A protein has these predicted regions:
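Conserved SAM-binding loop of SAM-dependent methyltransferases across substrates and taxa
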Residues: 112-125
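A short glycine-rich, Lys/Arg-flanked "PGG" loop and its adjoining helix->strand segment in the class I
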Residues: 192-205
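SAM-dependent methyltransferase
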Residues: 210-281
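C-terminal lobe and adjacent flexible extensions of AdoMet/dcAdoMet transferase-like proteins
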Residues: 272-328
Length: 328
């Protein structure tokens, strides 16, 4: 859709340039701009035609396309998750807040249990519980992630197919993670507040809840964002947003060099909660202190550094991701 729209726009720009040339006489710079526009349109058309041809050729020969051969969970882990940096932030922040090391972690909405596995890999005294209501994705995690752990390490990971609002663990945990915005599946204050109260019950006396959140004025728009990765493209789509209810529908798509696509590999039907709402709900649930950790920026470039610190004022950027840290 966006390629087609871009091609139309370029054609219109090329038309304006040519119209000016015909009316006012040839101008070298305008001629170059016109030709560049035509060349870009031609390249876009050629790439689209070649991709369609590749897909059709694969199907004609009975071969599977790259999209058909790909595993959506592998693509997700490569494009969305960075468990190493997440581990570093959680362990470092907990130690700074509580003056001790966290050992027992619960990963809510754990999916393929990537963070559970990262947690037990780091220290021999670390244990983890992953909770997800989807049994299929838990099975995938057992087969592809837990199986790769060193002998004995997998015994320190428990995966539970349960509702995060009802789950209990044998003993209180040091840390609960609710990452990748999954808690936004709860669309009412009653539902989300109930989840937060359940988390509070499951934490040790000095336990901490870690969450991420996203926002910015572009998060309310119906847009697509593309990111090129090794061997595929990741596409994040805001398919619809309702400003009255706050409900947002998002999709993750993947596209491949042969022109094939994995459309709607993942779909998220959420409420886009704001930071003030989340802080209020966490406080109402009984957490003693709630802080927003905002990404720091480089003074020279203005770009994010990947480091997060407590903040009470944030930049009104088009898009941002931050962490919420709630202490029991």
């Amino acid at each position: 859709m966006y390629v087609a729209a871009g091609a139309v726009c370029l054609r219109f720009m090329a038309y304006l340039c040519m119209h000016y040339i015909l009316c006012a006489g040839p101008d070298p710079e305008l001629t170059r701009n016109y030709q560049a526009g035509v060349d870009k349109v031609t390249i876009i058309q050629q790439e689209a035609a070649m991709n369609q041809k590749n897909v059709k050729e694969c199907r004609r020969k009975g071969k599977q396309t790259m999209a058909e051969l790909a595993d959506r969970h592998v693509l997700y882990e490569k494009s969305v998750q960075c468990v190493a940096s997440e581990y570093k932030f959680v362990s470092k922040t907990f130690r700074k807040l509580r003056k001790r090391k966290a050992r027992y972690l619960r990963e809510d909405f754990c999916g393929t249990a990537g963070m559970c596995c990262e947690w037990v890999k780091r220290k021999p005294d670390h244990t983890a519980v992953g909770v997800d209501i989807d049994g299929d994705v838990l099975d995938w995690g057992r087969e592809h992630n837990l199986s790769r752990l060193k002998p004995g390490a997998h015994l320190r990971v428990s995966l539970l197919q349960e509702d995060v609002c009802k789950v209990t663990t044998p003993k209180p945990v040091d840390v609960v993670l609710a990452m990748n915005f999954s808690y936004q599946i709860f669309k009412t204050r009653e539902q989300l507040g109930g989840y937060f109260r359940q988390v509070l019950k499951g934490l040790a006396d000095d336990g901490v809840l870690f969450m991420d959140a996203f926002g910015g004025y572009e998060s309310f728009k119906e847009i697509k964002e593309k990111r090129k990765l090794k061997g595929f493209k990741y596409i994040w789509e805001h398919a619809s947003y309702n400003p009255i209810s706050g409900e947002i529908l998002c999709h993750i798509h993947f596209s491949f060099p042969d022109g094939s696509k994995m459309k709607r590999a993942f779909t998220y039907d959420w409420r886009l909660w704001t930071l003030p709402e989340l802080q209020e709900l966490l406080t109402e649930a009984g957490f003693s202190r709630v802080q927003v950790y905002w990404e720091q920026t480089d003074d020279e470039t203005g770009e994010g550094t990947g480091k997060y610190k407590p903040a009470t004022v944030g930049e009104a950027d088009p898009g941002w991701v931050c962490f919420l840290v709630a202490e029991k």
